[in-house]
Amino acid sequence: MTCVIKLGGSLLETAALPACLAAIANRAGPIVIVPGGGPFAEQVRIAQGQWLFDDVAAHRMAVLAMQQMALLMHSLMPEFAIVADAASLGGASHVQPVLIWSPQIEQLDDANIAAGWDITSDSLAAWLAGFIQADELVIVKSAHVPEQASWLDLQQRGILDAAFQRFAAQANYKITVMNKDFFLSHHD
């Protein structure tokens, strides 16, 4: 049973990231971590506002921000392997208990994933979970996540990105969105 766990980039700002990674290390695998872009993606937003470059360039830079977060996570937990090719995650995750996905621009382009701020690492995690035929997707956020909230409600509150429902609508896997505190209290 492969589980994709998306760790929001804001976990770095709240200092919860190391604890979340440690909790994942104690969980039974196989697990694939999808990193949010965190402060690296925020710098892309700031730069786009200043320099007015297009959304395609911004989207690609945000994917690079996710790659930077993958490197950061690997530095904190060297026993977690980084894997770039999404196609190899399904089989590789059975050899290595925890993998960190470092998304590749070309692979996302080949999958016809549109460039824009409405598609963030939330939607990319949903896409990846479907692509590798995961059994579960867990999205861990710093924000408060109301119990029983629908995806649409979470999108309207800005907790999930605007495209998430599109990517998750045909999911053949369980999806859970939770706050970091709930994740840590149930997974460490």
Task: List the predicted regions and their residue ranges.
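Phosphate/diphosphate-binding glycine-rich loops and adjacent basic-rich segments that engage nucleotide
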Residues: 188
